[in-house]
Amino acid sequence: MLEPVTIEALNALGACLADAAGPNPPPAFDTWIDPLPDDADPALAAHIRHQALLRCYQARYVVLPETAPDGDLLERLDRHHGEDRMAALNAARPRLEAELIGPLWDEANAAAGDGDALAYVDRLLPELRAVASDPFLDALAADEHRRDHYRNFLLQSSADLLAEASASALGVIGEFGAPQSALFRILIDEFGYGAHDHKHSVLFRATLRSFGLDDAYNGYSRLFDSNTLMLHNAIHWLFQNPRNVFRQVGFLLFAETAYQRSTLFHARHLGRFHPEAEARYFAEHAHIDLHHTRMVVEEVVRPFLDRFGPGPGREIIAGAELTRAVFARSGAGQLALIRAFAATADAAWGLGPFAGPPVTPA
């Protein structure tokens, strides 16, 4: 059992990251985490630990600024990926994962039941495809501040969607037969089959810009809430650990099927309330994820079970249930925020001094 990261060690990590980033870093190199006071309540402590785990995972990505930064770019890269910085992140990561993601995985594993993956698929797909509406969007439809809330939804979603499929790309590295090729075909769909303007993260950037938001990766990371961080980190725990290969399949099974309905609801919401907004990101997913679910079931789940027997089935189910849990927490958090603002007479709206550039150069 790994011991949790101490407050002293976490604050030392934060100081290391701040030193490497320097003052006023471009978003690509901003790795800020909040300092953790000795008397922090558990919710704040968990939030800051999730911030640190976010930075552990982001450290494995190639992220470059949209325009040349002040100073020497190569020197910036040397600092950002420096040995001391990477060593500190790599030392903290397994402890943070055990503390933050471990309990979520235990709950998902307990929900996996008898491990019959094909029976689970037969239940799951009709269940998700029968979802009639999104409670968050239903609440927005009746709220006069729907644009502000939707901007926050986009801001929070940018944690994953501005680097969409980069996490799952780590799940196709190696050699594991025909299912690997099927997963790669799903991946290259997300990357627009090499046509940059069709890459899903580029489509999402256009949606951000249409709402007047900065579209730089990591641009709003200091505003990510706890549910956003938990969702991001659970997904990256799945895909940044090769041990989780069958659990990753469970994520894809749930996510690709759930997106068929959720993205359709978002496309309809934008068409009704924000017809001027760029909605291609959502319309594209509502269509293509129908094919992705079929590919996951027929070209990944079934071949794995035929090859290895029922053993991987339980992990596939648990991966799907972990995904269900973190998706539900994220959605519930957005809905609770709407209700909290509605109950607060003096709520302030807008980003205020936290706003970045109106639009990052495309």
Language model regions located:
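Non-heme di-metal
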Residues: 1-362
